[in-house]
Amino acid sequence: MKKIKFFFLILFFFNSNVLADNNNDFEKWKIDFKQRALANNISEKTFDLVMADTKFLENVIKYDRYQPEFYEDTKTYVSKRSSTKKLNKGIDFYQNNKDLINIVENKFEIEKELLLSLMGIETNYGTYVGKMDILSSLATLSYDKRRSEFFTKELLILLKLIDENQIDYKSLYGSWAGAFGFFQFMPSTIKNHAIDFNTDNYIDLKNSHDAYASAANYLKKIGWKKNAPCFYRITLKDDIPKKYLNVSAKKLLNKKKLSFFKQYVQNPDKLDFLKSSYKVAIITPDKDII
């Protein structure tokens, strides 16, 4: 019994020391990061104001190492995010914002069904936008070594947006990864695609008008075409070379014209309604949904 108590006592102090070291090193990192921020034309006044209270958040590192998108199979991931309760909440949101939703669909030519689905997945129609201090989250991930450069750039962009009075830093609470608002925009997405749709001289992504229109603007700018073909289920022949099979949509390799891939598809005539010149890629589904 004494050995067990001793073991946990040592473990407790060991973890405490690790956390203390991280906090000390984090404060040193902030001093160095300030020089980089100033070199990127962020005012010292803004930096000192918004970064003074940023803290190293140990939980952010834990969340970064375990993300459900990477560990849950497709069936589990989808079922958690497509409940009847969520569906009804989406219907309520549409009924309460019908005029805005229809205006945005017509202006940006993005299907309302797509936008509503994305909003449901990201924040359950604005009911859960996250409670993490985004500045501390981004600073923690910038200090961390795993994806430091990516999050450093995001933090610098966010500081610049604050410096230019485009965003109120006091409202910056969201996801552990630094995403913000009803559609969970990262700072670079805010910079490049967020818009002041209600023309109040302020971009508020926790406001339905700005958030919904910004999401539509983002999809339009990255090339989404309304009612254009996206995914179709096919059955492949056994002789297709494995190099043409993608296991993820994140990085599609070997894109070819549809006419090329038809030779490997059973019943290719079922795809005749699509233009043969379309560039396509093949994605294999997870084993759990085959």
Enumerate the language-model features and the residues they cover.
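An acidic, Gly/Ser/Thr/Pro-rich helix-cap/linker signature
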Residues: N23-N96, N102-E105
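Solvent-exposed loop/turn segments at secondary-structure junctions
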Residues: T54-F56, E122-G126, L236-D238
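Sec-dependent N-terminal signal peptides
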Residues: I4-N15
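Basic/polar N-terminal segments that are highly enriched at the extreme N-terminus
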Residues: M1, D21-N24
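Flexible, glycine-rich surface segments
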Residues: N165, Y169-I290
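Acidic/His-rich structured neighborhood in mature extracellular/periplasmic domains
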Residues: A37, Y77-A216, K220
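Sec/Tat signal peptide C-region and signal peptidase I cleavage site
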Residues: S16-A20
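Intrinsically disordered or highly flexible coil/loop and linker segments, enriched in small
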Residues: S43, I110, W224-A228
